[in-house]
């Protein structure tokens, strides 16, 4: 019995001890919770706020690690935890705009004309922007607003930067060989920083084909050519227009009759079939080229800037392909074997000077088997001095292995050989020599003339062409000589480019009515194989295209000419050799994303504005970032702009920037500029 009582007492004692321990533990638990809610958030045994970072348990063998900062008491009060997630931070307004420089780093040092500091900090978030003709600053597509560019002075309506650089021309060591007619571009930072004004009374150009025969006087307000050449049936003024009867110095009865005579002399010339691309040297007002267009012939008409006042400007206003260019000390910007026929009618060039170096340049550009047509006084006059010039010309052409195939009246026609056999059979020491095999006859950018005969390709490349129009879509042999990465798939690339642009141009013709908007003079600023121009020709859009091959890419000019198209080499970091208001359409596909590494995009856009006619259009296909930045610049030039998706859809990294240089805006700017000038004088 006693043992039983002792056992019960022991059990009761253990029970009480356990109960007391539990009560003390519960009391400590609630006491700790009370302290935690009073602000001791660093108590590691309890926290009402869930842990924000994961807890990692380490092996005891690794060593014990303590979060010391978690044990430090902070005297400042801690706010109680929020029952709802904290609101997102206010959006930060971006106040700095930058571009990626050539080193690949972001920089905020850039220039897009003059800008308003306050407006530059106002951001637009719209997806498409259309510019306004008002002078007020408006927000643009992306990140910054740009103040409108100023208008250049009134005396710059016909300014060509690289040909009107008076200070550079004054510094030339010599001008005996026409150096003043060559490119003498402004130094970096000295180019255009304003938009070129239009002449007073400027009107929308007369559409083709009427423009072949008449243009508005106020668009090219110069009468000197009428005074000098009116008696030669070139040009005359009637009321508010210039009229072009179609004559020339050596074909006063009209270009059509003159062309018929050439065709009768050499039937194999076959205009529009065998002969597709022609060079007219010293072109006057380009009636020769204008009348060849009706025979499916493209003629590049060239002349220096001031031999006859504004002759190239008249040609371009008529809607005829033309460029300001001269035979001086450098190669012309066209490839070897480019032209099926070269024409010179009283072009005022001494072909025999310096042992015929200028005729050697013609020989470089003339296609193997092509024709040189010379209409000049030495051909038919019997004065002693002129007869000597004729004999010198015969001697030179014989040494060039040209064959005089026909001489009739005032016209003489030579034919270039189709291979090098004649050159190699000449006697030792006969000049001019053949160029060495290392010479690249297609290298033309700032390259001096060479006193040697350009070799003809032994494999017949450049000479074996399909007749027009089959040659337009036939991959030419010289496609294999272009310095590009692909070798085997070149023809496939050629065909793919043609199909690509035909599909796009078909959409433009149907949706944007390209056949109805009066496109005539077109410039493709990065032409590739010429697929854009070929598509326009194939779809019968009544225009001509000058295909520009940038110096920064592969030289595809030989392919351009072998297709029966026109092209030229150019560096878009420099101004283009043409008058203001030359083109109805400027097309640039992938140009700016490449050239922005070398060139100032604002300078390029100002040059585009200079050569674009009022009412003209610009189509830029490039990356999203590039087109957004260009849209801002276009707005600053008062272009009407809109950014569109490509056919690839909204997720494509490319966009199409459509721009229009509205005539009303140009006229409004000119009027406002004149008012400001008068106000300053008053």
From Swiss-Prot:
It is a single-pass type II membrane protein. Glycans are attached at residues 67, 103, 125, 155, 173, 193, 273, 350, 395, 419, 600, 625. The chain crosses the membrane at residues 12-32. It holds the Pfam family Methyltransf_29. SUPFAM superfamilies: S-adenosyl-L-methionine-dependent methyltransferases (SSF53335). Belongs to the methyltransferase superfamily. This is Probable methyltransferase PMT12. It comes from Arabidopsis thaliana (Mouse-ear cress).
């Amino acid at each position: 019995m006693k043992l039983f009582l002792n056992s019960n007492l022991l059990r009761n004692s253990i029970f009480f001890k356990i109960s007391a321990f539990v009560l003390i533990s519960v009391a400590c638990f609630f006491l700790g919770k009370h302290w935690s809610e009073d602000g001791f958030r660093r108590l590691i045994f309890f926290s009402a706020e869930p842990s924000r970072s994961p807890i990692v348990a380490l092996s005891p063998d690794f060593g014990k690690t303590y979060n010391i900062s978690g044990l430090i008491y902070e005297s400042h009060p801690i706010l109680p935890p929020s029952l709802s997630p904290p609101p997102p931070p206010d959006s930060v307004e971006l106040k700095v705009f930058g571009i990626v420089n050539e080193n690949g780093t972001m920089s905020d040092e850039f220039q897009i004309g003059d800008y308003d500091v306050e407006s530059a900090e106002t951001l637009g978030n719209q997806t498409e922007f259309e510019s306004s003709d008002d002078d007020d600053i408006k927000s643009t597509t992306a990140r910054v607003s740009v103040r409108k560019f100023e208008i250049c002075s009134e005396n710059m309506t016909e300014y060509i930067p690289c040909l009107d650089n008076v200070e550079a021309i004054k510094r030339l060591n010599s001008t005996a060989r026409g150096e003043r007619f060559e490119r003498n571009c402004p130094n970096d930072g000295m180019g255009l920083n304003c938009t070129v004004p239009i002449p007073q009374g400027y009107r929308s150009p007369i559409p083709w084909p009427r423009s072949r025969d008449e243009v508005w006087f106020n668009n090219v307000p110069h009468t000197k050519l009428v005074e000098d050449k009116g008696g030669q049936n070139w040009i005359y003024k009637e009321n508010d227009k210039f009229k072009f009867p179609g004559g020339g110095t050596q074909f006063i009865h009209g270009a059509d009759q003159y062309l018929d005579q050439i065709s009768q002399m050499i039937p194999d010339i076959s205009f529009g079939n065998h002969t597709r691309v022609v060079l007219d040297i010293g072109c006057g007002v380009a009636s020769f080229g204008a009348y060849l267009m009706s025979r499916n012939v493209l003629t590049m008409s060239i002349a220096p800037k001031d031999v006859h006042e504004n002759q190239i400007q008249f040609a371009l206003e008529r809607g005829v392909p033309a460029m300001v260019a001269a035979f001086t000390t450098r190669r012309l910007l066209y490839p070897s074997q480019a032209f099926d026929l070269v024409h010179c009618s009283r072009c005022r060039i001494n072909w025999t000077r310096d042992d015929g170096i200028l005729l050697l340049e013609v020989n470089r550009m003339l296609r193997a088997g092509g024709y040189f047509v010379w209409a000049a006084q030495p051909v038919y006059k019997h004065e002693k001095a002129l007869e000597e010039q004729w004999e010198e010309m015969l001697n030179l052409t014989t040494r060039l292995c040209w064959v005089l195939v026909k001489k009739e009246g005032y016209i003489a026609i030579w034919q270039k050989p189709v291979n090098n056999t004649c050159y190699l059979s000449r006697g030792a020491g006969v000049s001019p020599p053949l160029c060495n095999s290392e010479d690249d006859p297609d290298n033309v950018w700032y390259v001096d003339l060479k006193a040697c005969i350009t070799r003809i390709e032994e494999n017949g490349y450049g000479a074996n062409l399909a007749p027009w129009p089959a040659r337009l879509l036939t991959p030419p042999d010289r496609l294999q000589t272009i310095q590009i990465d692909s070798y085997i798939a070149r023809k496939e690339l050629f065909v793919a480019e043609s199909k690509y642009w035909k599909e796009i141009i078909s959409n433009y013709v149907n949706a944007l009515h390209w056949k109805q908007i009066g496109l005539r003079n077109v410039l493709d600023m990065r032409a590739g194989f010429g697929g854009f121009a070929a598509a326009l020709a194939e779809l019968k859009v009544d225009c001509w295209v000058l295909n520009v091959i940038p110096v920064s890419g592969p030289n595809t000019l030989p392919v351009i000419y072998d297709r029966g198209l026109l092209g030229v080499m150019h560096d878009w970091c420099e101004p283009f050799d043409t008058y203001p208001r030359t083109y109805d359409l400027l097309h640039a596909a992938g140009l700016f994303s490449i050239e922005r590494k070398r060139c100032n995009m604002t300078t390029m856009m100002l040059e585009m504005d200079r050569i674009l006619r009022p009412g003209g259009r610009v189509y830029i296909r490039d990356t999203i970032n590039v087109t957004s930045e260009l849209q801002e610049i276009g707005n600053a030039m008062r272009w009407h702009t809109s950014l569109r998706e490509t056919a690839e859809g909204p997720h494509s990294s490319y966009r199409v920037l459509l721009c229009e240089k509205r005539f009303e805006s140009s006229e409004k700017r000119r009027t406002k500029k004149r008012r400001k000038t008068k106000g300053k004088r008053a």
